[in-house]
């Protein structure tokens, strides 16, 4: 898992990188957490701002 995929996609297990639907707040979350889906762990990323 070299590249991180954030935002929602067709499968919940697989998150694809979609910057168009990704919000600015969630986008930062994705950059910090490269092992989890930005949307699924949005709350956790918010805590570790």
Curated annotation (Swiss-Prot):
Entry comment describing in which tissues the protein is expressed: Testis.
Location of the protein in the cell = Nucleus; Chromosome
GO CC term (a single one): nucleus
Q: Which GO terms of the molecular function aspect are on file?
A: DNA binding
Example GO BP: chromosome condensation
| Major localisation | nucleus
Keyword annotations of the record: Chromosome, Developmental protein, Differentiation, DNA condensation, DNA-binding, Nucleosome core, Nucleus, Spermatogenesis
- What is the annotated role of this protein in its UniProt record? Protamines substitute for histones in the chromatin of sperm during the haploid phase of spermatogenesis. They compact sperm DNA into a highly condensed, stable and inactive complex.
Family of the protein in this entry: Belongs to the protamine P1 family.
Q: What is this protein called?
A: Sperm protamine P1
Task: Give the originating organism.
Answer: Rhinopoma hardwickii (Lesser mouse-tailed bat)
């Amino acid at each position: 898992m070299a590249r991180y995929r954030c935002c929602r996609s067709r499968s919940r297990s697989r998150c694809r990188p979609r910057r168009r639907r990704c919000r600015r707040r969630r986008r930062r979350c994705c950059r910090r957490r490269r092992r989890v889906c930005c949307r699924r762990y949005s709350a956790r990323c918010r805590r570790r701002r």
